[in-house]
Amino acid sequence: MSWKFLFKYPSPSRILEQADEDMTTSVLLIVALVLTICAVAFQIIGVAPPYWVSIDTASLKMHYGLWTTCTEVQTVTTCEDSDADEDWQKAVRAMSILGLLVLSVAVFMTVLKLFVMKDKKPVLFAGIGTSFAGGIFILIAVAVFAAKQNDELANVDFTYHFAFAFSIIAMITAFAAGGVMLFSMTKE
């Protein structure tokens, strides 16, 4: 009887080591999935409401976002759709929506890697790329919007409101998710 068949199979300690590495990778990918889902939710909250900027004077209260402008004069509030007349407004809208869509793809890629194509690295690369791309799109939108508001409202006392902050949080969360996925790739 030959004992060579014992050397074909990994030792029990190697099997446990491999299981531990797989567990670490799975936990990291679950963390990345949660972060990516949070980034999508934060970006939805950031894009939808008319609360990117708030202006509050003695006679007028006004707040607006990417799509709607609301004005309150003597307790009468009116809201109307904002026309994106200038190119920078169209660019901010486009970058915000692209960021949301690309982050949705990142969620899909992370789910694919975690549950369906566990040993396919290209799916992980796509998840990493889309997560970082979504963050970059949102960064461009936020930076352009803030620069233009600071220029156009230089003589007006205004504050950035919660939806603007949620877009920034979505961007940071997207970068964090991409970083966690990148780190999990080094563990594989």
Enumerate the predicted regions with their spans.
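Non-transmembrane, juxtamembrane loop and terminal tail segments
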Residues: S2-L16
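Signature of small four-pass
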Residues: I15-V53, Q89-K148, F164-E188
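Juxtamembrane helix-loop transition sites at the ends of transmembrane segments
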Residues: L60, K120, N155-V156
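Coil-to-alpha-helix initiation sites in intrinsically disordered, low-complexity, charged segments
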Residues: S2-F5, D22, G65
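Interfacial non-cytosolic loop connecting adjacent transmembrane helices
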Residues: T75-E80, A84-D87, A146-F164
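A surface-exposed beta-alpha-beta supersecondary segment
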Residues: L16, I45-R93
